[in-house]
Regions:
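Conserved helicase RecA-like core
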Residues: 1-250
Length: 250
């Protein structure tokens, strides 16, 4: 919208003194990088300050900063809290074979007392594929990820909030707009890239006085990544048991 107004001559940017790019990683994930670059180029030559905020620092962010920012200062803020996970959240962690994960998820979704559930995938492709697989198995499921248009994402979020679907498959960045207190289960279909993302994921359940369950499925090729998270957060589960869709423990 900003670009359209500027190109029509209805918006003058020559007096802009401060430009703030918030949720920069989300902009990249949702495909807004070309639009952001166009706005930055429109300000090129103007004396202004640029501030860029990002929960994570993906690869394309750094070249963007180098191109459009002069001698940028990188400030990293960390939480001083030591209790990273809610005591009201029961954590269940186990290793699962990649080819068996969909069946394991389907089994877990039939748990007694399960309500609204968010399933986290690390990639847009995995999120889309899992949502399709669960829908074919008869579950009422929505999806939010960067390959979907804004209207499709908003439609899925609305359906989840209003109870039209009780399962939402999401990537980490696309899930930031979700604000639902009564999520009973969070399922980590894929292990996240870092400990804080894990904390943010499971923090979606066990909120506002409710109890919750956080299930983490560690793929055999994800064990090293999980052990980093386990050590950083002192979870005490460096080598989770191996479970299958037919396991009685599940």
């Amino acid at each position: 919208r900003l670009i359209d107004l500027h190109e029509r001559g209805n918006l003058q940017l020559d007096r802009v003194a401060i430009l703030v790019l918030d949720e920069a990683d989300e902009m990249l994930d949702l495909g807004f990088l070309p639009s952001v670059e166009a706005i930055l180029k429109a300000l090129d030559g103007n004396a202004h300050q640029t501030m860029l905020f990002s929960a994570t620092m993906p690869g394309p962010i750094l070249p963007l900063a180098r191109r459009f920012m002069e001698k940028p200062i990188h400030i990293r803020a960390e939480s001083g809290e030591q209790d990273f996970t809610h005591s009201s959240t029961r954590k269940v962690t186990f290793q699962a074979h990649r080819m068996d994960k969909v069946a394991v998820v389907a089994h877990a979704l039939q748990s007694s007392g399960r309500g609204r559930t968010i399933i986290f995938a690390r990639t847009k492709r995995a999120a889309a594929q899992l949502a399709d697989d669960l829908a074919r198995r008869g579950f009422h499921v929505g999806a939010v990820h960067g390959d979907l248009g804004q209207k499709s994402r908003e439609k899925s979020l609305h359906a989840f909030r209003t109870g039209q679907v009780d399962i939402l498959v999401a990537t980490d960045i696309a899930a930031r707009g979700i604000d639902v207190d009564d999520v009973t289960h969070v399922i980590n279909y894929q292990v996240p890239d870092d400990p804080m993302t894990f904390v943010h994921r499971i923090g979606r359940t066990g909120r506002a006085g409710h109890t919750g369950t956080a299930i983490t499925m560690v793929g055999y090729d994800e064990l090293g990544k999980w052990q980093v998270i386990n050590d950083e957060l002192d979870l005490g589960e460096p080598n989770p048991p191996q479970w299958f869709s037919t396991s009685p423990e599940l």
